[in-house]
Amino acid sequence: MIGTLGPERKMNLTVACSGENHIEPRHALHAGLITAELLTNAVKYAHPTGLPVSVQVRYETNDDGSFLVEVTDDGVGFPENFDPTTDGGLGFQLMRALTRGLNAELQFEHDCLGVCARLVKPGTFGGANIESTPAVKGN
């Protein structure tokens, strides 16, 4: 996937997983597509000058069926006045639609270095154990 962006784009990727619970295949598919789009955006836009981008992916599952996927980069962040709930191209539209399909929330923090995106899927067996910050619903 990242290789299709050209050899001039470099990424240092760190992945951390916690929890021993499995998620439904449909949920895994949606979460995987959202993660792929977030990684692609990080490589394409985090460092417009072409510097390597550092990206951390964190995946967490809980007994109640809830899960969290967090993708954080060290880039320049969103452009001024960019609203991830309404702006963006086809990739952001896709992420919002997939988030709706999961009945999940896609949260963005971008007030510091880079962008932090969190996909939070509440549990299907009761209340979610994953802490959630104010969210951007998949509009």
Language-model regions, residue ranges each:
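Conserved short strand/loop->alpha-helix "switch" segment adjacent to the catalytic nucleotide/phosphoryl-transfer site
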Residues: 6-37, 43-51
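Acidic ATP/Mg2+-coordinating residue in the GHKL
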Residues: 73
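Flexible, glycine-/charge-rich segments associated with ATP-binding catalytic modules
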Residues: 4, 8, 13, 33, ...
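Active-site-proximal flexible loops/turns
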Residues: 48, 80-81
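Glycine-rich G1-box
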Residues: 76-77
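Structural preference for long, well-ordered alpha-helical segments in enzyme cores
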Residues: 1, 31-42, 59, 94
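Short beta-strand/loop element within the Bergerat-fold HATPase_c
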Residues: 52-65
